[in-house]
Amino acid sequence: EVNNIMILGGSRIGVRIATELQDEANVKLVEYNPDKAYKLTETLEKTLIISDDGRNIDSMIEEGLSNMDAFVAVTGRSETNILAAMVAKRLGVKKVIAEVENLNFINLAESMGIDTIINKKLITASNIFRFTMNTDVQAIKCLTGCDAEVLEFIAKPNSPATKGQIRELDFPHD
């Protein structure tokens, strides 16, 4: 059971997680930028907002990191997220999640014992893939070797994807 959660980073993801969980758990959100931290106090009324540097291990221990059931690192830097997640894991946090946007670091992060890796590019590609598979796809081509991945879908005749403009398709908004 997860009762105490610490989120590192007041990013969109961090705010969304805090918003979703603040009614059901004790949520602490650590944000480095003091101005941003202050603004977050206005929108996250049931979340304890802490303006501090999450890279400072002593500060994180002082804020109760070792007493957390879960830790989520979602700053804008993959390296910071990986290191903070490793510290949380070593301090005994049961569930550790890190956002890793640098695709080169994903295998490294997984090998370090981080429980869950979040990568927005892979999540988006997966959601598009899943949505498109529901529309009767005939073939898929994947091009790699650069900073982006491109999937080419060939939709079968009469599938919903062929009956109008892309903006008219019922893509999920999340």
Language-model features and meaning:
Residues E1-D174:
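Cytosolic regulatory regions of ion transport systems
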